[in-house]
UniProtKB/Swiss-Prot annotation:
CDD domains: FN3. This is Leucine-rich repeat and fibronectin type III domain-containing protein 1-like protein. Residues 384-412, 563-601, 630-687 are annotated as: Disordered. Residues 241-287 form the LRRCT domain. It comes from Danio rerio (Zebrafish). May be involved in the regulation of excitatory synapses. Residues 287-376 form the Ig-like domain.
Length: 687
């Protein structure tokens, strides 16, 4: 009984010691442990994995990313297979604990970039399979930890245009190198010369037009198939490339090979022909011919100029330029030579006057052409006969580095030559220097400066009448070395010489202050816009209110005009019919007269005249309402009434009461003429 209990406990301990994920197969073949999780639908690396596992296969699942904790402390793992998943992300130092790992399979995933930290810690890796991914970039230091141990590298079926060739050239232990089915266009010369153990190189189906001869290909036999080839041979596969079959591939044509799968894509007379069936004498190159070059070129001293030289040939020739002194022109801060044959001179000097020679060369030969450059001196502002020779002309090479010219003697840094920094910001600096009156015949000043992290000099030429210069487009937070040189004529040799005025070193401000300034300007402009908007809105509201009030009063006046009675009121005295006295009226009368020829006389014109009585207040409206219909005179009997002002002239008359009939007024005939005479002095009132 005790023995049975002990056996059960032993089985339980052994079962708990071996952790096996669900739906996976775990093989415990001592002393190794293998876990196989193929086609199990995993979305991530199982967490329940024995850390003593030697072989782990997680193929054909749906894992999208791998992290460092997935393989932490698995120091015994030798073989890791993650093929045919959907891995698109590898976290840095994911495999850092796999010190003994020998084979890593990551083929058929979705990797696009390999960085420096992806394979850190794999110091014993021998097989790295990265085929069938979407790789377009591999870091130059991605394979640094296993450069001396890697034996098999597979980069096939990716999107690689360029490969870190320097890294490939240091894989001294590599045996198989597969780079087929990519977009590689160029292979550097001699890149495989140190790969002494290389047995198979596959460059099939790329965009290679030529394969440069390599010392490795000449030392050992090269074959097209691995079957039947000696152990000390190299199997080279380069079919499916658009080969340009000229003299540059003649070395490959002379190799002993059995296959005839490669064809030529160019030149036109060899297109689609089998590479190995073309005779050697047809692998020819055309020497270069210069087809176009610049004519005689004129330039002003200190100004930029450009020289052109175009050449054709097979293969495309390389163009180099030779200066009038017979020196090869290299790319500097003053001169730039381009692959298309152009030569750019940023600052011309009188010493550049002469004949420049362009040399076009390729594998078939070379061709030369000449271009004459004439540099005209700047106009003299003073009489050259009065110039004297400067005892210390200083360096005459305008390409002198700013840092080297800054280490001059203390004499040249005297107070009168000192360059000062007047203003400084994050992206600009204002420098000033005193007038150089002791320099005779100064043509211009040359400013040259560079950053502390960049040795490339920047040149600026300014007139001799200027004593300050604003340097723009600087980088914030950088240290700059700046020197001012005076360009003048040597009175004896008539050559252009330069002498240093002074140098200064400064550090530009950080971008923070500029951001604050921009922010304050931005806030100030915003406040101005807001205040202006408020003023404009207030004016618009005021105009709208005036328009509304005008419209309301206009409608009110129109309605009042429609309701106004058109009548002619005639006032009479209170019982004084014979005298023709008219009582005072409190209403305001607007009387309009129509006269012929501007005359107010005539009975007919007086009878035809009309008057408008406008009622403007409630009191007047009440008085008009009390007038009876008999008081309103017909147009044929209308007479001009007298106003209270006229009646007040007569003390015997009163204008307080004024209602009488037309018959009473007619009886006062003796006074009619007097009344008509007085009516001429009446005035109109418009309300």
């Amino acid at each position: 009984m005790e023995w049975l209990i002990f056996s059960l406990l032993l089985l339980a301990v052994s079962a708990s010691g071996q952790l096996c994920p669900k739906r996976c197969m775990c093989q415990n073949l001592s002393p190794s442990l293998a876990i196989l999780c193929a086609k199990t639908g995993l979305l991530f690396v199982p967490t329940v994995i024995d850390r003593r596992t030697v072989e782990l296969r997680l193929t054909e699942n749906f894992i999208t990313a791998v992290k460092r904790r997935d393989f932490a402390n698995m120091t015994s793992l030798l073989h890791l297979t993650l093929s045919r998943n959907t891995i698109s992300q590898i976290m840095p130092y994911t495999f850092a604990d796999l010190k003994r790992l020998r084979a890593l399979h990551l083929d058929s995933n979705r990797l696009s970039v390999i960085t420096d930290d992806h394979f850190r810690g794999l110091t014993n890796l021998r097989h790295l399979i990265l085929a069938n991914n979407q790789l377009h970039n591999i870091s130059p230091h991605a394979f640094d930890d296993f450069l001396g141990t890697l034996e098999d590298l597979d980069l096939s079926y990716n999107n690689l245009v360029d490969i870190p060739w320097d890294t490939i050239g240091r894989l001294t232990n590599v045996n198989t190198l597969n780079m087929d089915h990519n977009l590689i266009e160029h292979v550097p010369l001699g890149i495989f010369s140190n790969l002494h153990k290389l047995a198979r190189l596959d460059m099939t189906s790329n965009k290679l037009k030529k394969i440069p001869p390599d010392p490795l290909f000449l030392r050992i036999p090269v074959y097209a198939k691995s079957k039947g080839s000696p152990l000390s041979s190299l199997v080279l596969s380069f079919g499916g490339n658009p080969l340009h079959c000229n003299c540059e591939l003649l070395w490959l044509r002379r190799l002993t090979r059995e296959d005839d799968l490669e064809t030529c894509a160019s030149p036109p007379d060899l297109t689609a022909k089998y590479f190995w069936t073309i005779p050697e004498e047809e692998f020819i190159c055309d020497p270069p011919v210069i087809t176009r070059k610049s004519p005689k070129t004129f330039a002003m001293e200190g100004q930029p100029t450009s020289l052109k030289c175009k050449a054709n040939g097979d293969p495309d020739p390389d163009v180099h330029w030779i200066s009038p002194e017979g020196r090869l022109i290299a790319n500097t801060s003053r001169t730039l030579s381009f692959s298309n044959g152009s030569l750019e001179i940023n600052i011309t000097s009188l010493k550049d006057t002469g004949i420049f020679t362009c040399i076009a060369s390729n594998a078939a030969g070379e061709s030369t052409g000449t271009v004459e450059l004439v540099v005209s001196p700047l106009p003299h502002l003073a009489n050259s006969t009065n110039r004297i020779r400067e005892p210390d002309p200083g360096p005459s090479d305008i390409l002198t580095s700013a840092k080297s010219t800054s280490s001059v003697s203390n004499e040249t840094r005297s107070q009168e030559r000192k360059v000062v920094l007047a203003e400084l910001s994050a992206n600009s600096a204002l420098i000033r220097w005193p007038s150089q009156q002791h320099f005779p015949g100064i043509r211009m000043y040359q400013i040259q400066y560079n950053s502390s992290v960049d040795d490339t000099l920047v040149y600026r030429m300014i007139p001799s009448t200027s004593f300050d210069f604003l340097v723009r487009d600087l980088v914030s937070g950088r240290e700059y070395d700046l020197c001012v040189l005076a360009v003048y004529d040597d009175g004896v040799t008539s050559l252009t010489a330069t002498r240093q005025v002074g140098c200064v070193t400064f550090v530009t401000e950080t971008e923070f202050s500029q951001c604050q300034s921009l922010r304050s300007h931005f806030l100030g402009g915003t406040m101005i816009i807001i205040i202006g908007g408020i003023i404009v809105a207030s004016v618009l509201v005021f105009i709208i209110i005036l328009m509304i009030r005008y419209k309301v009063y206009s409608q009110h006046g129109a309605d009042s005009g429609k309701g106004t009675a058109m009548t002619n009121v005639r006032s009479q005295t209170n019982g004084g019919q014979a005298a023709g006295q008219v009582p005072r009226s409190s209403s305001k009368i607007v009387e309009g007269q129509e006269a012929s020829g501007g005359s107010l006389g005539g009975a007919a014109n007086i009878k035809d005249s009309t008057a408008l009585v406008l009622v403007t207040d409630s009191e007047t409206a009440v008085q008009i309402s009390e007038i009876s219909s008999e008081d309103i005179v017909s147009p044929t009997q209308r007479h001009h009434p007298r106003t209270c002002i006229e009646l007040k002239r007569r003390p015997s008359l009163s204008c307080k009461e004024g209602t009488s009939s037309d018959t009473q007024e007619d009886t006062a005939s003796p006074q009619v003429s007097d009344e008509k005479k007085a009516q001429r002095d009446w005035s109109d009132f418009k309300i």
